[in-house]
Regions:
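Mobile genetic element proteins and their domesticated derivatives, centered on retroelements
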Residues: 9, 24, 40, 80, ...
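RNase H-like two-metal-ion nuclease catalytic core shared by retroviral integrases
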Residues: 138-142, 146-151, 160-182, 193-202, ...
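Mobile-element integrase/transposase regions
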Residues: 34-98, 104, 117-125, 129-133, ...
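C-terminal domain-tail junction helix/linker
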Residues: 156, 179-240
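Short hydrophobic alpha-helix segments
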Residues: 108-109
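Basic, flexible linker segments flanking DNA-binding modules
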Residues: 1-76, 142, 167, 221-230
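Conserved catalytic and ligand/cofactor-coordination microenvironments
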Residues: 20, 114-116, 140
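Hydrophobic beta-strand scaffold residues
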Residues: 51, 159-160
Length: 240
């Protein structure tokens, strides 16, 4: 049994390159392996699977920022941009969205240029599908602080919550999501074309939503957490 477990652990680690032993342990449990995290840690070390990480810089002590807490899906989202480059060195941008409560990413857009009008187009498409937040946390970038998005938000009856300039910690949910995107996708691929970048980044978004266990969600995936929340709310409304 242990040899089979060792082989399966190696296989998972080969696919989930940036997953540590704790998240790999969750995946093994999901597959039916009845093993504790200590055994997985021992095999993980014996197989030399430890992730190489950069040494963390010592941070200056600062006051902890208390972020607004969402209590249901679509109460509060965050959105932001990430930059990367093709194999040819041509730059492209990634427009990211994340739900604070479920940690789901409702959409991700990749292109060489993403103006405010494109941001509105994406949000309007989601709203047409019945997916619309009450509040969106954003920075003060021109795509978010311009008139196009402001007018759209007013028409749709939602609030834009701008963080203070130079305070990305106030947008921690999207910063965390962007970090995972870079570590688990952008840093692992050479994109030859913008089409390839779109395909691989969208595939990562779907995998993140549907298959990636999230520690803040009690090791559920974002999609599982959202589905279970909707189910429990439906049961409450039915009076059971």
């Amino acid at each position: 049994m242990w040899n089979e477990l060792r082989i399966r652990l190696r296989d998972l680690a080969a696919v989930r390159i940036r997953y540590g032993y704790r998240r790999l342990h969750v995946l093994l449990r999901r597959e039916g392996w009845k093993v504790n995290h200590k055994l997985v840690w021992r095999l993980y070390r014996e197989e030399g699977l430890s992730i190489r990480t950069k040494g963390r810089k010592k941070k200056i002590s600062r006051l902890r920022v208390v972020l607004p807490q969402a209590k249901a899906p679509n109460e509060r989202w965050s959105m932001d941009f990430v930059s990367d480059g093709l194999f040819t060195s041509r730059r492209f941008r990634v427009f990211t969205l994340v739900d604070h409560f479920t940690r789901e990413s409702p959409a991700i857009v990749v292109d060489h240029s993403i103006p405010g009008s494109k941001v509105v187009e994406v949000l309007d498409h989601l709203a047409g599908l019945g997916i619309k937040p009450q509040v969106i946390t954003v920075d003060n970038g021109p795509e978010f602080s311009g008139r196009v998005l402001d007018e759209w938000a007013h028409r749709k009856g939602l609030k834009l919550d701008f963080i203070r300039p130079g305070k990305p910690v106030e947008n921690a949910y999207i910063e965390s999501f962007n970090g995972k995107l870079r570590e688990e996708c952008l840093n692992l691929h050479w994109f030859k074309t913008i089409e390839e970048a779109k395909e691989k980044i969208e595939a990562w978004r779907k995998d993140y939503n549907e298959h990636r266990p999230h520690s803040a969600l009690n090791d559920q995936t974002p999609s599982e957490f959202a589905e279970n929340f909707d189910l429990s709310r439906a049961v409450e409304k039915a009076g059971f």
